[in-house]
Amino acid sequence: MGKIIGIDLGTTNSCVAVMDGDKPRVIENAEGERTTPSIIAYTQDNEVLVGQPAKRQAVTNPKNTLFAIKRLIGRRFEDQEVQRDVNIMPFQIIKADNGDAWVDVKGDKLAPPQISAEVLKKMKKTAEDFLGETVTEAVITVPAYFNDAQRQATKDAGRIAGLEVKRIINEPTAAALAYGLDKGKGNQTIAVYDLGGGTFDLSIIEIDEVGGEKTFEVLATNGDTHLGGEDFDNRVINYLVDEFKKEQGVDLRNDPLAMQRLKEAGEKAKIELSSAQQTDVNLPYITADATGPKHLNIKLTRAKLEALVEDLVARSMEPVKVALSDAGLSVSQIDDVILVGGQTRMPLVQQKVAEFFGKEPRKDVNPDEAVAVGAAVQGGVLAGNVTDVLLLDVTPLSLGIETMGGVMTTLIEKNTTIPTKKSQVFSTAEDNQSAVTIHVLQGERKQASANKSLGQFNLEGINPAPRGMPQIEVTFDIDADGIIHVSAKDKGTGKEQQITIKASSGLSDEEIQQMVRDAEANAEADRKFEELVQARNQADALVHSTRKQLTEAGDKLSADDKAPIEKAVNELEAAAKGEDKAEIEAKIQALIQVSEKLMQAAQQQAQADAGAQQAQGNNGGDDVVDAEFEEVKDNK
């Protein structure tokens, strides 16, 4: 059985790890980095760049460089959070035919799972290069507060990338696994505060050790799937834009190129202010008007940054209070606080967390790598390599169905340990009703329309009877990935209807299969492109060496001998500029064949040179050589 890798598919950065013996190991990518920017770029010549190469060209290609795609995954275009992003993202977010938020790149409509699959493919390749074997299975992490649609979409991304997703686990739970695996004996309750690039989670987790086996039980989780480092960056960018407008009278918001430079500079300034008290944001030639070029030079202090984002930090504390309340615990009952996610490096975040919990958070967990490490541990558990760990996660949101009057009737309460199963009997609302629609909802509101609709299905063929008489048993079954299966059964007739909830929109199996085929076709295209480049490089080297030999041969070759060689060189040079690998290889062989006389001339020249050197050496006098040998012997 192959290795099951652990992937932290992050909003801003992604990371991959694997169990190396009995220890989890974070794997470095081709650029030598332990994390990879979750950035995907589509270039003019239809090349797909992922990670650092995509980030490097973002300034010159803002409309086709996609980032923070995780904020769109499993979401409807009309969602309030998506509408906020529509106005600030340099790329074009569009409404798909199924109502989901997709992205338009150069006229192609791309689904978020399809885009995220490019990052997962990079993670898969990183692991394969390290392990020296093909990887087909993975554990992928998601924010604890992701709903069913977002979890399904993440699994779809894995399938498109050629991975069988063995388990979806929650990011804070994965971080707890990474933290608790090598800690000493004894039971403890920890809070995992996970503020990443685009999402925020808070989980209360109890770590128990019984008979050498560690149990990680999630007591409660809460969060905000649209709060993270990207929002902090946007505050900085907006401040810089407003300051520049005050000084220069130019609004940079209409200039995608300038905004991309600002995004880069804003993120850099934010990071610098975690260790410095102030920084200069200096962007020469940011734009130009009739009076000439304009330069942006603005001082940003840590105090100003904190003033810009303090409400975001305060917003993160609300889910903390809810999770503690749901777990039935007070702050004093929390033994340790773990910080996860790059944004937790900000001193203000650390200060507010310490103030709330009345203790300093732990510093011995790497906020960028802990989640991937935990996913790798879970991969080891599923592969049977790690046997002393048991993970008990929860469903983050309540689940139920819509009942008469537009009310949501809850079957499974939030923070119920998964996997779980729950049944409840309902009846008809009207006399002689022959069918019922089961409308599945996820959320905490009593009003059905205020919750997330996960889908609906019909149970037909109910025997005519007065209202309230038929007995319809609705069963919810949540698997270990947190994905929901619902069935409805008429107890009178025994008729049953069941579905695995797909998002009310989401990707159909056909669409996913098509995207898998596209991804495989791209892999084939990438391989062919690599072979073409190798052939071109071989051609360039041969052209260069042949021309050099022609020059060195001088008059040792007649013009008649040189002409076919020069013709073959020119033909190979022209072929190397084209896209036909077979033609390049044919021209390489043709040049090698016509160059035989040139090779002979070059060999003769080399032999003549060697003979001349030998003769020169012999004329140098034997005495000197003898003396040298004698000297060496004396030294010994």
Swiss-Prot record:
Q: Give the Pfam families listed for this entry.
A: HSP70 (PF00012)
InterPro entries, from UniProt?
Answer: ATPase_NBD, Chaperone_DnaK, Heat_shock_70_CS, HSP70_C_sf, HSP70_peptide-bd_sf, Hsp_70_fam
Q: What Gene Ontology molecular function terms does this protein carry?
A: ATP binding; ATP-dependent protein folding chaperone; unfolded protein binding
Ordered alphabetically, the record's keywords are: ATP-binding, Chaperone, Nucleotide-binding, Phosphoprotein, Stress response
Disordered as annotated region, ranges: 599-636
Would the keyword Nucleotide-binding turn up in this protein's UniProt record?
Answer: yes
Source taxon at top rank: Bacteria
Reported induction: By stress conditions e.g. heat shock.
The residue ranges flagged as biased composition, category Low complexity, are: 600-617
Residues bearing Phosphothreonine? T199
HAMAP family per record: DnaK
* PANTHER family per the UniProt record, alphabetical: HEAT SHOCK PROTEIN 70KDA
Question: What function does this protein fulfil?
Answer: Acts as a chaperone.
Q: Which family does it belong to?
A: Belongs to the heat shock protein 70 family.
Q: Could you tell me what this protein is called?
A: Chaperone protein DnaK
Species of provenance: Mannheimia succiniciproducens (strain KCTC 0769BP / MBEL55E)
Q: Which gene encodes it?
A: dnaK
